[in-house]
């Protein structure tokens, strides 16, 4: 066999069509996040890494490319990083430098993030999880955009279902000769039942360079956009708290997305106008065989104008 094996990937393809993304998915790496005066946070992260491919090239040197990708990821995660989006940005920029045939590189990362907290009523220590979402795109002109965000779970209560329950309760109380003021006061203090859903909220922020946002703040915004937070540990007072809180703030799936937008505007009113915000809410319905979904992708400047109007 010849010592010089043919470079098939560098040959011309049978069909001259360029490809938007070619790469590897599911690359697992440990990532350490720096914390001042504390041990770093260690994440088991999964990376997807892509480059674009011109129409004149058959392949992207997948096996050789994987060595480069693995080497760059090892270098990027060898020391504690300030942010996961910076790790993605660093790898994307190195990919552009390493490949003379590509014009754009994209790196995506997901990891599970543990949150230490206390139960809402009994103040018992517990832990919650959130999925971190980070990505970066670098191009041949030296431009890099980075994205950071999260996916969290919570609960919601249907306002329509609750409204029907409240109407029924009002009719019953009127039939028992309870006066109108007392009925109004009771219904104001005691929210009526509505069917509940497990809610899934996703919130990401993308800017040119490193987004000037805090991951924990984004997690809080996403969790608080639903009717109530949920907890792994819950004694009876905690269950009562979550039930009461959720029914006191019943929300449609659309309301949750709008709450995310409003929460982001309140926390970060000065983000650049060209910041891209992605907000999604999916609710697992309890009384239907289908689920509910709403989303919005918008520039921050547009969101700011809509809320002000």
Curated annotation (Swiss-Prot):
It catalyses: GTP + H2O = 7,8-dihydroneopterin 2',3'-cyclic phosphate + formate + diphosphate + H(+). InterPro entries: GTP_cyclohydrolase_FolE2/MptA, GTP_cyclohydrolase_MptA. It comes from the Archaea. Its EC number is 3.5.4.39. It holds the Pfam family GCHY-1. GO terms for molecular function: GTP cyclohydrolase I activity; GTP cyclohydrolase IV activity; iron ion binding. The record marks 158 as: May be catalytically important. Its cofactor is Fe(2+). HAMAP family: GTP_cyclohydrol_A. NCBIfam families: GTP cyclohydrolase MptA (TIGR00294). This is GTP cyclohydrolase MptA. It comes from Natronomonas pharaonis (strain ATCC 35678 / DSM 2160 / CIP 103997 / JCM 8858 / NBRC 14720 / NCIMB 2260 / Gabara). The gene is mptA.
């Amino acid at each position: 066999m010849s010592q010089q094996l043919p470079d098939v990937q560098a040959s011309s393809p049978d069909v001259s069509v360029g490809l938007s993304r070619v790469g590897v998915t599911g690359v697992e790496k440990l990532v350490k996040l720096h914390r001042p005066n504390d041990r770093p946070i260690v994440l088991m992260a999964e990376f997807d890494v892509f480059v674009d491919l011109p129409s004149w090239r058959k392949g992207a040197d997948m096996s050789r490319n994987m060595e480069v990708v693995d080497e760059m990821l090892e270098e990027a995660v060898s020391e504690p990083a300030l942010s996961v989006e910076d790790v993605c940005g660093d790898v994307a920029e190195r990919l552009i430098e390493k490949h003379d045939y590509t014009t754009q590189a994209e790196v995506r990362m997901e990891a599970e993030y543990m949150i230490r907290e206390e139960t809402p009523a009994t103040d018992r220590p517990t832990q919650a999880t959130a999925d971190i979402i980070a990505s970066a795109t670098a191009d041949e002109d030296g431009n890099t955009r980075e994205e950071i965000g999260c996916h969290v779970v919570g609960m919601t209560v249907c306002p329509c279902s609750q409204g029907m329950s409240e109407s029924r309760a009002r009719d019953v109380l009127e039939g028992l000769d309870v006066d109108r003021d007392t009925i109004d006061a009771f219904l104001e203090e005691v929210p009526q039942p509505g069917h509940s859903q497990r809610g899934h909220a996703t919130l990401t922020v993308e800017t040119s360079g490193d987004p000037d946002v805090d991951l924990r703040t984004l997690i809080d915004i996403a969790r608080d956009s639903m009717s109530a937070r949920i907890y792994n540990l819950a004694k009876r007072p905690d269950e009562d708290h979550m039930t009461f809180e959720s029914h006191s703030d019943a929300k449609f799936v659309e309301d949750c997305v709008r709450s995310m937008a409003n929460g982001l505007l309140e926390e970060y009113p000065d983000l650049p106008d060209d910041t891209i915000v992605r907000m999604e809410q999916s609710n697992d319905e309890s009384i239907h065989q289908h689920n509910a979904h709403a989303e919005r992708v918008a520039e921050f400047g547009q969101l700011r104008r809509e809320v002000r109007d």
